[in-house]
């Protein structure tokens, strides 16, 4: 990964495709989903996630919980993990950067729900730096103070919400060609090995 907007000299390669290259077949239209924000995940090593859960765990419109087990997690409000498809009953899915990138942004953008997140700071092969707030996802402040205002707006304007979903689906779709992705990865590796002197440079 690289810092978003500062990756000109970085080498980005998808080395964890089995975990990150996930897309869901969502058959539930946005208008038929619950007017709810959902988040499940571990808050370990993520102050942002902890702060979100502590702020909204008693809010009936925000379904959020820490999926860690054990006494150390009780203070944040724990719950069992749920399947990715179980998230799809909600119109909005929170997306957080953890130790680095926000890994669930990839599958959320393949669905009929909308990713909600502060502006991403890190960038991977998914090109998060090219994501546009209000176009590919709903951007909220780092302190989430405008979260409910934002979701109320898109609940009241489902046609604009659908536009974001369509744009997100289009963005995610460019990564679905596995042969093309493999070819790009090989070219990236080839160029890296050439630049580091591990392969002789070519004219192509």
PLM regions: where:
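Catalytic binding pocket for nucleotide-activated donors in carbohydrate/polymer assembly enzymes
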Residues: 81-204
């Amino acid at each position: 990964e690289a810092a978003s907007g500062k990756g000109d000299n970085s080498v980005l390669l998808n080395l964890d495709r089995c975990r990150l290259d996930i897309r869901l077949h969502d058959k539930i239209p946005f208008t038929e989903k619950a007017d709810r924000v959902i988040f499940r995940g571990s808050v370990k090593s993520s102050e942002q996630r902890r702060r979100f859960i502590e702020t909204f765990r008693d809010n009936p419109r925000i379904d959020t919980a820490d999926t860690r087990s054990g006494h150390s997690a009780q203070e944040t409000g724990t719950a069992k993990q749920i399947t990715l498809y179980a998230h799809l009953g909600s119109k909005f899915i929170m997306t957080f950067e953890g130790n680095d990138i926000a890994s669930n942004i990839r599958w959320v953008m393949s669905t009929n729900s909308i990713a909600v997140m502060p502006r991403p700071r890190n960038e991977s092969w998914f090109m998060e730096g090219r994501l546009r707030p209000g176009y590919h996802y709903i951007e909220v402040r780092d302190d989430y103070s405008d979260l409910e205002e934002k979701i109320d707006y898109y609940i009241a304007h489902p046609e604009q919400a659908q536009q974001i979903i369509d744009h997100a689906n289009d963005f995610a779709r460019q990564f679905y060609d596995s042969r093309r992705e493999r070819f790009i990865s090989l070219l990236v590796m080839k160029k890296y090995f050439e630049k580091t002197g591990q392969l002789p440079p070519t004219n192509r």
